[in-house]
Amino acid sequence: MKTTKSKKLYKQALKLMPGGVNSPVRAFKAVGGNPLFIAKAKGSKIYDVDGNEYIDYVLSWGPLILGHAYPSVVKALKKAIEKGTSYGAPTELEIKLATLVKKAFPSIEKLRFVNSGTEATMSAIRVARGFTKRNKVIKFEGCYHGHVDGLLVSAGSGGATFSIPDSLGVPQSYTSETIVLPFNDINTFKNTLKEHWKDIACVIVEPVVGNMGCILPKDEFLKVLRNETQKYGIVLIFDEVMTGFRVSFGGAQQYYGVKPDLTCLGKVIGGGLPVGAYGGKKEIMALVAPDGGVYQAGTLSGNPIAMTAGIETLKVLSKASVYKRLEKTMQYLEEGLKDSAKQAGINVKFYRAGTMFCTYFTENEVIDAKTAKTSDTEKFKQFFLGMLQKGVYIAPSQFEAGFISLAHSEKDIEKTVQAAYKIFKKL
């Protein structure tokens, strides 16, 4: 497989952009080698500038649940762009997309569109603080909620700690209001709320942790979060930027039967264009300007191009047959990868929620960030590079989720499973 043009472009990019990329994981630092530069994409495939074809399980990090360049989305975008790219004024398109989102997520009574998942989580926390008149935030180790200063933190020693910054340029004063707890640890969570509840404005969580692979909530974890936050008057925020429309049409909250106070969305609702949204109970959202005193704004928020792509995507997803088809494809991939690993005699743990998944190279059950980190990242590196050579593109990090789309065919899955078996045997 030749990647001459990609290598040449990467050298040029390194002179212009930090690491040659505009988001760190794209640089392939966790797996070695040079990143691929993509020329085009269609359906389940991406094509690099050297003409190589890959079955894509990254799908722009989740948004493209219909596949690349889905015909009805492309058609709608062509019409929309001829009318103008942005108006900086309200449009009917915002109402249409908001209505579709509300239909899928009954817990969202009012919502506000923004331009990214980071903006959504940042804004939701601001509103929660305004509503409760408290300052502290609980998040969980391994959960990523965008590059918000106050949430770029890591836990210190012990179960519950007041956090230190996880990035240069973030003052400790910004993160001193953030408490990091282990995911799936019910007792530590209960004890922390019992001790600090008077100071805690909100609890924010990825209901399925997609930024440490794919860590599922165990037992009654999400229900405990709901019950305990209600008891102490704390706002519960579900960060469904990744799980929204991925785990099910109504996201993780529908799948697990737990309704948060606020929900953050992104990725799928933009159909591949930049978008985010946050929303929830009317009495909380009533604080958002211009109705209330919590300020939040955006030049391109609700722009007609992103709204159009989102509307067309959700229209397709609202059809009853779509999730049945996605589930069938996902089951086929899951069974194939598990069988391949077993036949090859390699220990892996496969987890999935709806159409997002991860294969961990470990013998341990993965229930939190600590157990996720027992994965053999060197084996994953070899697996990634081997799959790439065989025309299968997975996330270039052990700790990122993979995704399927409506465009993935049985033939795609069969090729993927066959490639995985051959690579597993070499590990």
UniProtKB/Swiss-Prot annotation:
Location(s) in or outside the cell: Cytoplasm
Pathway: Porphyrin-containing compound metabolism; protoporphyrin-IX biosynthesis; 5-aminolevulinate from L-glutamyl-tRNA(Glu): step 2/2
Primary localization class, coarse: cytoplasm
Catalytic activity, reaction form: (S)-4-amino-5-oxopentanoate = 5-aminolevulinate
Enzyme class: isomerase
GO-annotated biological processes: protoporphyrinogen IX biosynthetic process
Pfam families: Aminotran_3 (PF00202)
Protein family (similarity comment): Belongs to the class-III pyridoxal-phosphate-dependent aminotransferase family. HemL subfamily.
Residue positions where N6-(pyridoxal phosphate)lysine is found in the record: 267
Cellular component GO terms held in the UniProt record: cytoplasm
Enzyme Commission number(s) of this protein: 5.4.3.8
The protein's name in its UniProt record: Glutamate-1-semialdehyde 2,1-aminomutase
Cell inner membrane in keyword set: no
Assembly: Homodimer.
Cofactor: pyridoxal 5'-phosphate
Keyword terms of this UniProt record: Cytoplasm, Isomerase, Porphyrin biosynthesis, Pyridoxal phosphate
GO molecular function: glutamate-1-semialdehyde 2,1-aminomutase activity; pyridoxal phosphate binding; transaminase activity
Matching Gene3D superfamilies: Aspartate Aminotransferase, domain 1, Type I PLP-dependent aspartate aminotransferase-like (Major domain)
KW Nucleus (keyword) present: no
Chain coiled-coil ranges: none
Organism name: Thermodesulfovibrio yellowstonii (strain ATCC 51303 / DSM 11347 / YP87)
Xref: CDD domains: OAT_like
HAMAP family linked: HemL_aminotrans_3
